[in-house]
A protein has these predicted regions:
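Flexible lysine-rich "adenylation lid" loop at the C-terminal edge of ANL adenylation domains
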Residues: 196, 202-222
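Hydrophobic/anchoring residues in structured secondary elements
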Residues: 20, 152, 200-201
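Short beta-strand-to-turn element immediately C-terminal to the catalytic PLP-Schiff-base lysine
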Residues: 2, 53-57, 68, 76, ...
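Conserved ATP/PPi-binding loop(s) of AMP-dependent carboxylate-activating enzymes
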Residues: 59, 68-96, 112, 127-132
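AMP-binding/adenylate-forming catalytic core of the ANL superfamily
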Residues: 77, 104-194, 204, 217
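Gly/Ser/Thr-rich phosphate-binding loop
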Residues: 3-59, 64-66
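A short, polar/charged loop-to-alpha-helix boundary motif
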Residues: 222-228
Length: 228
């Protein structure tokens, strides 16, 4: 929202950097910030790691990163908590010196590379034997000129297990794009498996307290509706 306010944009541009976290930032927002002269640094971390410990994909000194089988991110090192006072099962601290997160990611060049956070494991969509993460699909949809905001989620499907569904907010003055147009747009950069099979146009996306899209609310809203 600050990028739509000239005074706020100018104030942010005077800072050394603006730290963002909580999930992957949409490319249009990053591009708009860069065009306004705002230095944006993407942070990654959680309470168990004493907050942010990876900045623009690069871990702080003393922080270790691994990507486990299945793609989950594991974090170790000096900033890591010893564990939970009341451990849960399975315990993400079970491996000594490491915390197994619920996030999926990739390291560019082995365990010493730059980390890319792909999304949450519990948000992955299993469709036709393939796994689709919402965030890369949202990033692709967000580059369509008619899409101002979007969210991707999975709905139960008798044939596929789950189908990929998109909810979009249309940009001011733009005609709503068709499902076919958005599928073709996504397929330019991702496998066609990731392209949405169902489209909903909404006025606003539901969000939780800290601003994250509430995918569960979208699932509840659109479950059982026919394809559009």
């Amino acid at each position: 929202k600050a990028l739509t306010d000239p005074a706020a944009t100018a104030a942010l541009a005077e800072l050394d950097a603006v730290l963002i976290g909580g999930g992957p930032a949409p490319r249009p927002i990053l591009d708009a910030a860069a065009a306004a002269g705002i230095t944006v640094v993407r942070t990654y971390g959680m309470s168990e790691t004493s907050g942010g410990c990876v900045y623009d994909g690069v871990p702080l000194d003393g922080v270790r990163l691994r990507v486990l089988a299945g793609g989950r991110i594991a974090i170790g090192g000096a900033t890591l908590a010893k564990g939970y006072r009341n451990p849960v099962s399975p315990d993400p601290f079970a491996e000594p010196g490491w915390f197994h997160t619920d996030d999926l990611g990739a390291l560019e060049s082995g365990d010493s590379g730059v980390l890319t956070v792909l999304g949450r494991a519990d948000e992955a969509i299993s469709t036709g034997g393939f796994t689709v993460l919402p965030q890369p699909v949202e990033a692709a949809l967000g580059t369509h000129p008619a899409v101002r905001d979007c969210a991707v989620f999975g709905l139960a499907d008798d044939r596929l297990g789950q189908r990929v569904v998109a909810a979009i907010v249309v940009g001011d003055g733009c005609p709503p794009p068709t499902l076919e147009a958005l599928r073709a747009h996504v397929a330019r950069t991702l496998d066609v498996t990731a392209a949405p099979r169902e489209l909903h146009v909404v006025n606003v996306l539901p969000r939780r307290g800290i601003g994250k899209v509430d995918r569960a609310a979208l699932v509840r809203r659109f479950a059982g509706e026919a394809d559009q």
